Amino acid sequence: MRAIVVALLLAVPLSAQTRKPPARKPAPPVVALKKVVPEVTCPTPLGVGLKTKVTYCEVMAGRDPAGGVLIPIPSHKGPATLSFDLHNLHLYSEEQVRAKRAFSRYTATIGVLTMDNTLISRAIVQSEFRTAVDLVDRVGGGAGPGGAKAVAPTGTEPITISIPEGEEQVSLLGEKLMVERIDGTAAYTQAGRPIAVISNVALEYKPGPPPRKPKR
């Protein structure tokens, strides 16, 4: 039996006895997520918060994405994540607060659209105002105390939207604002009317491959 085993070993080529398994290909490098603050095109800026120093942008009602709040999306692999804070807009009156007639309940709806007017998602913020403590901040650039404007953001809803791969820019447009007050309820949808306010816009994405150089 031993002689047979030796004979079989001799019959196998030496290269087969010493052949190594093929080397495994190294795994592709993991591309880290990148987070940036995009250069937002805001047609109707509200202003900068006096306390927070945050920039606020009004989102107007409309139907044409080119006229909305434009947010460029860098080249990305897979979906990109767009995040921002969504606020309602309140016209502050100290007299109404003192008279206990300032109560307002706001429900604002905006759309996030591609530039060919395809709806990606909607975002909603609902909040109530009773006194000045319900304001997120006062905004500079007005004639009020400390240079504050009469209008101010109230309520905050953190929004996160997934932007499909291939989209290079999105637009935010207002859809509808519902306002409930002591004297009744009203709905606003007409184009050009402020619907909501955004702040703290950010993007998180996995960078896409660099563009190929044209062959000469």
Language-model regions, residue ranges each:
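Compositionally biased, proline/threonine/alanine/serine-rich low-complexity intrinsically disordered stretches
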Residues: 8-10, 14-39, 211-216
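C-terminal edge strands of extracellular/lumenal beta-sandwich accessory domains
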Residues: 35-36, 74, 150, 159-216
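Short amphipathic, basic-aromatic surface patches that mediate peripheral association
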Residues: 80-102
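Short coil-to-beta strand junction motifs in C2/discoidin
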Residues: 95-108, 191-193
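Non-catalytic, beta-strand-enriched accessory regions in extracellular/secretory proteins
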Residues: 54-74, 79-81
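Extended, solvent-exposed segments with strong compositional bias
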Residues: 47-60, 120-166, 179-182
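Sec-dependent signal peptide recognition
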Residues: 1-7
